[in-house]
């Protein structure tokens, strides 16, 4: 079973991203869960989202505490004391939204850097400025 933990801020789309990931897994014939964790947070507040993908039925009904993969939408969450390495398994993967192509984190075996903010601005212009 693959377990994912998404770190983001409200409004960045992590809850939607987890749902899309799980829908894609289901289309591929796998089982999946998307588990958002948020309350009255406003836009910009930290949000955690969890997901699981498995070949068979998933009996676990809890947050993800030992992720194989962490997806970080905003590296500035570290400034709030949020530790994206918490509970990661050996050999885990980090997918991180940053413009720092040399971004590294020794807690992860693989680090995949994606400048999603730049891609969004190139495709859509300034987001949220209607």
Locate the predicted segments by residue.
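Active-site cofactor/cluster-binding pocket
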Residues: 1-130
């Amino acid at each position: 079973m693959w377990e994912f933990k998404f770190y983001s801020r409200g409004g960045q789309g992590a809850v939607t991203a987890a749902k899309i990931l799980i829908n894609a897994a289901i289309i591929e014939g796998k089982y999946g869960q998307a588990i958002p964790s948020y309350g009255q947070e406003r836009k910009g507040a930290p949000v955690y989202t969890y997901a699981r993908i498995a070949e068979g039925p998933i009996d676990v009904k809890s947050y993800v505490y030992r992720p194989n993969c962490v997806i970080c939408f905003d590296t500035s969450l570290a400034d709030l004391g949020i530790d994206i390495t918490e509970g990661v398994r050996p050999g885990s993967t980090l997918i991180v939204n940053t413009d720092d192509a040399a971004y590294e984190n020794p807690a992860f075996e693989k680090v995949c850097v994606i400048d999603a903010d730049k891609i969004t601005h190139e495709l859509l212009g300034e987001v949220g400025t209607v």
